[in-house]
Regions:
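Non-catalytic terminal extensions that flank enzyme cores
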Residues: 1-167
Length: 170
């Protein structure tokens, strides 16, 4: 929709971005924790296509107001990170957590794509989430794409076997 409304001929040097989130905070009776999706689509050059960063979060605070503040901080950090650290995906992920802790929020899935992220392996980004203590578990599908652990494991029987995976991307 935005691409059809923007007139590139009138604004050849402008870079555009969109930010979106779909989140639910904790309910009144505190039986359902907050969670949702956040993302940013942005250009680093007016003549390039757009890049996209999308991630899923679980909100850990026990107060809706605190969760809303956490969402605002994450959104601001995401936009800042997209424009300042797009060439360093690890730093971009770390910048999303500026002024936040795992006690506030857990990022359990992330996906980056676009012309500036062509060399980025999203599976490695998920492993960064584990390494940086932003989540406890990540899951890759058979196609190598990241999946949200809570969706994949919901109401499933699980067998865990200790092993090693070297290299993790093959």
């Amino acid at each position: 929709l935005i691409e059809s409304r923007l007139k590139r001929k009138e604004h050849p040097d402008k870079k555009y971005f969109t930010f979106a989130n779909t989140l639910a905070t904790i309910n009144y009776s505190k039986t359902v924790k907050g969670h949702g999706w956040m993302g940013c689509r942005f250009q680093t050059d007016p003549n390039k296509g757009y890049n996209e960063v999308i991630f899923h979060v679980r909100l850990n605070d026990n107060d809706a107001k605190l969760q809303q503040e956490t969402i605002g901080i994450m959104g601001t950090n995401l936009i800042y990170g997209c424009f300042n650290y797009y060439n360093e995906p690890k730093k971009l992920i770390q910048s999303i957590y500026d002024n936040l802790s795992r006690d506030n929020v857990e990022m359990d899935m992330i996906h980056m794509e676009g012309p500036d992220f062509e060399g980025v392996d999203n599976r490695l980004l998920s492993l960064i989430l584990v390494k940086e203590n932003m989540t406890d578990a990540v899951i890759f599908g058979a196609d190598g794409k990241n999946q949200q652990p809570s969706d994949v494991l919901y109401k499933k029987n699980i067998l865990t076997i200790r092993g090693s995976f070297r290299p993790v991307t093959k």
